Amino acid sequence: MTVDNPVSYFKSISSVRETTKQVFDYVEQNDGQGNHFKMELSKMDDVVDFLCSIIARDYGTDYSSIPPHGRWQHLNCGNVLRVESLIEQWSGAGIDEVEISRKLIDLFVFSVLVDAGAGNTWKYTTTEEGNKAFDRSEGLAVASYYLFVQGALSQDTNDKFKVNGKKLTELTMDEFCQGFQVSDANPLNGTEGRLKLIQNLGVALSTNPAIFGKEGRPGCLVDYLYSKCTKDNGTAVVDLNDVWNALMDGFTSIWPAGRTSIDGEPLGDAWVLDTKAKASGSDAFLDSIVTFHKLTQWLCYSLLVPLENYGYKFTIKNKDMQTGLPEYRNGGLFYDFGVLTLTDGAYKRGLALTQKLGDNSSKIPTFTPEDGAIVEWRCLTIGLLDYLLPLVNKKLDYDLVLPQLIEAGSWKAGREIAAIKRPDTKGPPIELHSDGTVF
């Protein structure tokens, strides 16, 4: 490939769909045969039917009420309007709308960046809400919420409802485990990697004052974007690329050093894939790279509603540049319905790692994040979500946008089919041996 600035390109949002689509198109045109998976699009009808039944159950035909995919819904899990209660509390205290938007961004950034897969056994119990227990993404969301409202993330003694970089850099393992209720009896996947990510987030916030202000707050992103916006009849208009670039530039340093890099600069959630090289017809390093930027995309999706509805109330252009999220619920949906099947060699390799990690009874394959099986799975997941959207819209006779499809359908359907097929764990059909910074 020939691009003027490879680092800039691979960190861009446009690179995600472009690089992964090459893999999807190659597998589709190769009779569904990838290096690690077999893809059978003929089985997509079953996915569509299952997904549409969930939408009908949860929303009836009121499709316009489906919110875009975002962290807001996780923070409100258990039918508790935690976010709205905070907003009401702040408004009642006379806090202006722009500062409310900063506080929401503070909370959402922290909450999203701790949202890598929690594993099958960890739970968070809310003593403040009658000892309700939440697991997985919702548990991590509620844990992050209580750390925020208790002031554990703020260095401002006069305002506990903030996230400050300096405070995050000082977070200890004991404080992390206490905040997330981690113990030998309640283990959380990737604890050390997750804490390091938080500490690195603190460094990023503290060393990027142009974006995060003198306080090193995620919420100062609001003011940075306002400085970049154009005005249209009094409305602040910003392009998704500006939001994206601020997140990528601001948070590049949080990623582990071992990730794919060019000239020593890490690219974030980007990986080398043999299938991509084959699809490109080239063995060159740049032609083998695919990008996902899943946590940044999840963050971007989650920030759009606060940015649009509070404070400066931005109008955000080109939101459709984002892709579906390449994580285990969306990907698991296609695997559990047989649209994707691991090749024999990949399955045996994954099962060997499962057994090496001490589980000799499980038939669930396990892979590390850089394994070609995981990387190809994620590429195909993005392509399949794009393929799925028009099929669902045709059946519903309504034009959902991709973030609505993920929120009401694919992510939820992936979780529900997992619970049906694996009721003991409700876990995904493929396990990731994770450091707490992927998925």
Curated annotation (Swiss-Prot):
Look up the coiled coil feature and give its residue ranges: none
Superkingdom as given in the UniProt entry: Eukaryota
| Record function comment | Involved in uracil catabolism.
Give the family, as the similarity comment puts it.
Belongs to the URC4/urg3 family.
Q: Please state what the protein is called.
A: Uracil catabolism protein 4
Organism for this UniProt entry: Lachancea kluyveri
